[in-house]
Amino acid sequence: NGTGKTTLLKILNRVVSADSGTYTLGSNVKIGYYDQEHHVLHMEKTIFDEISDDYPTLTNTEIRNVLAAFLFTGDDVFKQISSLSGGERGRVSLAKLMLSEANFLILDEPTNHLDIVSKEILENALNDYTGTVLYVSHDRYFINQTASRILDLVNHTFVNYIEVLRSEERRVGKECRSR
């Protein structure tokens, strides 16, 4: 905590500017961003309207099918965003993100506030996703289910997590041998 992970994601998404350094994204990269506070949601709208207003070419049936995949069925789709729990807002944000044409998803703590079933939906959606995904998470189970590569931010530098594990194993081994 406090190492700048969220700030880095915001820089990559151009929400904030970097103090120094540069980065370049490919010319065809379209970013989809998921933040912990769900700033993309409009509190005064219903779940259904939140999707239909952003994706007006979708039919009512298509919208209901997408929302059902994120556990919103029947009259639930007409609940106002402001009345939803954190986990429910997370599911709406994820539904919007998966509908976007983004080919690079940036997710900040995507499993926060999600129940087990919602986490499984997210895991399946990410595992089926064909683009690039960069996320910050402390949820070890989620990481194990979805990550193909793990980086650790140590002293403002990314380190391959496999190397971090090996270093820790060597340290523990030395401690055990010295006893």
Annotate each PLM feature.
Residues 1-171, 179:
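ABC ATP-binding cassette signature C-motif
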